[in-house]
Every structure is written in C-alpha cells, then in structure tokens.
C-alpha cells in the first residue's frame, strides 16, 4: 500500500543526500495516473516543486486535452508550471530517428534547460535542483524483461536505476511501488487523471510486453512483479561486488606515464577469455560490447596497430596497450606575451626573457629551450605537431621532416601523437621537450634570450 508515511520512509532510505526541504524539484507530469500520484505526494510533503509538461503533438486532440488537464491540475494545487509544445514527428524525420528516441531527446533537453533556469532563479541558495519522474515497479519489470530478451549483461538486468546524476540529476522515487498501489492512493485522495490511448496499442515492444506477455506470466506466477523486483535488488548488490573486483584487477595492471594510460598485455591476458573483465574496462572509452573480440585481437597485433572509438584510441606498443584520448591531437593555443605561463596537455610552459650577458649557465636538459629573443615575432602558437611539419634540428644545417625526426627518437605511438610544437607563423621554433630549431638558437651576437621551461610534465 502506498501512503504518505511509507513514501517518505522510502525516500529517506533511497535518497539520504536529497533533502525534501532543501531541494527544488522539477516534476515531469504527463497527466497520467503515475505522474499525478507523484505530484500529489510531493504536494502533501510541502516540497518546493515546478511542474513541466511536454506536448509532443502526436495524438491530436488528446494531446491538447492532456496539456489542459495538467494546466488545471497545477493551478488547483498552486504549483508553478511550464508547458512546451514540440513538433516531435518533424524532429524525428529531420534527425533520422524513431519517434520514441526523438521524444526522449526533446523532453530531456528541455528539462535540462528548465533546471538551469530554476537554479539561476534561486540565486545563492545551496538548494539542489532535481528532476523527478514517475517510473514505477511495473515499468521496472517491463524494462528488465526487454533487456533480457534483447540480450544483456549484469548491468542491463539491474533495470532502471533509482537515480542518475550525469548531465542532469534524475530521481525515480516510485520504482518500488506498483501501478495498482498508485491507483489505490489516487482513489483514496479522489485524484483524477487522463488516460493515454496509445498505451493500449501494441505498436511498441514495451506495450506488447505490458499488454500481452505480463498478464500471461502473472497467471502462472502471481507474485511475478515482486519476485523480479527482489531479483533486481540482489543483482544490484552483486554488480557492486563484481565492479569492485574488476576495478581492483585493472588497477594492478595499469600505469600512467606522461599522461598516457598503459595496460600490461601480460596482465590483460590473464582474463582474455573472460568478456566481463574486458567489458568492465573498455566500456568507459566508447566501445560497444560487440567490439570485445576485436579488442582481444589487438593484444597479439603488430606494433602500432590500434582501435579507435569516437573518444579514444587503444594502441599496441611493445608489451602494452596505450590509451590515448582522441582530442589530444587538436590543441591550438595562442601565446601573446613574452613572459608568463601557458598550460598545455603536456605540461606547463614558463616563458621569460633574460639578458644574455647575465643569464648564467644554460641547462642542457631537453625540457629547457633558449631562443634568440630578437628573432621572435609575437604572437606564437602552441599546437600538436602535424605530418606536414619540418624544422632544422639544433646542430643540423638542413631541414628535416618532423615525422622522421620523431621516428628516430623511438617514441611510443601514444607519446608521439601528443608531442607539442611552438611555432611562429609557418616556422617551427621548438619541438617541445625534444629539440629547438637551429635557426633560432642563441649565438655570440644574441643580446636577449627567450627562455622557455617545460614544467609539471604530464
């Protein structure tokens, strides 16, 4: 049974860090039973709320009816509300996606915007802004069954999370409450709501499971919903244990040097036949489960072989796999002054101009550069090297392709990819941390020196 008291108890158990008193809640309200019930519960608790209703304009007069119902409902409870209408079908066609995906993108983008507006409106207050949705136990069971039949891992079988906090903070306080319990609560408080006729159509997989499959299952297993929820709870506990074990395993095989994460291939091969270990590591780098076999093949590939995702590259180098962000080769930073600091992906560059006569002994380590300041024209540009770059390495009188120069240093592909250069127009002054250009070195005629130091190397 759903009561105000047990709802509050569940809240304090599930969301101990989210104060009902010091949080502003954005309520996603369709006008259906579930969102009306949740809204009324928050109203009875005296929580600070704003109602948000999205009119997707997909059901003609019924969509208009829902919008009017939510408007009247919000006014009756004296809760601030926002309504927005979207051309969902046109959005789906423009971006070549299904209606359900389009509706999801539209509503969460708008919710994100509203939450930022609410946060701005409350000013210096420390109150959190949290989105509440009315997903309930029946939704949870449907989701788990859909994941199971599609094929999934342990995480997929844990269903809908009680909360998530990525781009926006979302809580689902009714996940442990069945639709029948919400219906009884609504009846007790004489709450009215609207029915979405599309829920009766079996055009979507979820509706088929809800309308056709679950009733048959419940004829055989009367406690099916409760049993699935209990199983989900146990699987969530098991997932924590599995994740901790996987994290500990990879921690033993990983090192970070010069900002490059490297994994021992010998260590990886201990679990090569266990896809769960590999997936536990690679999923956060943009891989898909279908790529696990491809990643395993990389362990025995030739030096320099790699697999790329939209965010990272996994590169084979000797007895390691190196993990490099894809954006590491896009750095471009203008340098406008002759003195000061410049933060780069490879470390901090410190610039200073000194009198050649008073400079003292030069430090010959590679992370120091001494250039003839009178030959320098500002601004300079710090960027990642390119395949078309060339320069005159210190000590040589002829130009050399930078690609060939870096190749002679026997650098790993990951480190080579991240090398930065300091340029003046189309002239390369310094391969940072490696070699300056001979044309800009100090000479006996040098009066002023631009000294550059690479500090805090990544």
Across the structure, where does each feature detected by a protein language model lie?
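Core alpha/beta nucleotide-donor-binding catalytic domains of modification enzymes
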Residues: 1-215, 244
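AMP-forming adenylation/ATP pyrophosphatase catalytic core
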Residues: 2-33, 50-54, 86-88, 106, ...
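Short, surface-exposed, polar/charged, turn-prone segments marking secondary-structure boundaries
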Residues: 78-81, 109-112, 158-162, 198-199, ...
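Alpha-helix boundary/capping and short turn/kink residues
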Residues: 150, 154, 179, 218-222, ...
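Internal, active-site/partner-interface "lid" segment
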Residues: 200-206, 227-236
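Conserved anion/nucleotide-ligand pocket segment
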Residues: 211-212, 216-228
């Amino acid at each position: 049974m759903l009561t105000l008291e047990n709802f509050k108890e569940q809240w304090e158990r599930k969301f101990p860090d989210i104060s009902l008193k010091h949080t502003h809640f954005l309520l996603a309200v369709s006008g259906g039973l579930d969102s009306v019930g949740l809204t009324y519960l928050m109203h009875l608790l005296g929580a600070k709320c704003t109602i948000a209703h999205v009119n997707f304009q997909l059901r003609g007069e019924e969509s208009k009816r829902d919008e009017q119902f939510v408007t009247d409902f919000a006014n009756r409870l004296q809760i601030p509300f926002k309504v927005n209408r979207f051309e969902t079908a046109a959005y789906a066609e423009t971006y070549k996606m299904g209606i359900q995906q389009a509706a999801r993108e539209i509503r969460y983008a708008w919710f994100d915007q509203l939450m930022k507006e609410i946060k701005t409106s409350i000013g210096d207050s420390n109150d959190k802004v949290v989105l509440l949705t009315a997903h309930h136990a029946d939704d949870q069971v449907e989701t788990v069954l859909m994941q199971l039949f599609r094929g999934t891992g342990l995480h997929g079988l844990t269903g809908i999370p009680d909360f998530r906090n990525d781009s926006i903070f979302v809580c689902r306080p009714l996940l442990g409450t069945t639709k029948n319990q919400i219906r009884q609560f609504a009846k007790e408080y004489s709450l009215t709501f609207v029915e979405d006729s599309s829920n009766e159509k079996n055009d979507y997989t979820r509706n088929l499971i809800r309308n056709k499959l679950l009733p048959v299952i419940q004829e055989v297993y009367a406690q099916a919903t409760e049993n699935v929820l209990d199983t989900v709870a146990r699987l969530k506990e098991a997932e924590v244990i599995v994740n901790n074990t996987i994290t500990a395993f990879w921690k033993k095989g990983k090192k970070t040097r010069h900002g490059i994460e490297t994994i021992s291939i010998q260590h990886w091969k201990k679990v090569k036949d266990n896809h769960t270990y590999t997936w536990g590591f690679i999923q956060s780098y943009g891989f898909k489960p279908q790529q696990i076999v491809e990643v395993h093949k990389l362990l025995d590939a030739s030096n320099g072989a790699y697999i790329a995702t939209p965010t990272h590259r996994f590169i084979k180098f000797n007895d390691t796999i190196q993990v490099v962000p894809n954006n590491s080769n896009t750095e471009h930073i203008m340098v406008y002054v002759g003195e000061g600091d410049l933060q780069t992906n490879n470390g901090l560059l410190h610039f200073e101009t000194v009198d050649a006569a008073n400079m003292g002994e030069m430090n010959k380590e590679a992370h120091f550069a001494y250039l003839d300041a009178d030959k320098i024209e500002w601004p300079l540009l710090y960027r990642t090297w390119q395949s078309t770059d060339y320069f005159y390495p210190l000590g040589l009188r002829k130009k050399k392709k930078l690609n060939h120069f870096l190749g002679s240093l026997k650098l790993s592909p990951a480190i080579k990819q991240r090398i930065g250069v300091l340029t003046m127009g189309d002239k390369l002054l310094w391969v940072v941390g490696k070699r300056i250009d001979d044309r800009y070195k100090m000479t006996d005629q040098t009066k002023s020196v631009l000294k550059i130091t690479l500090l805090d190397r990544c």
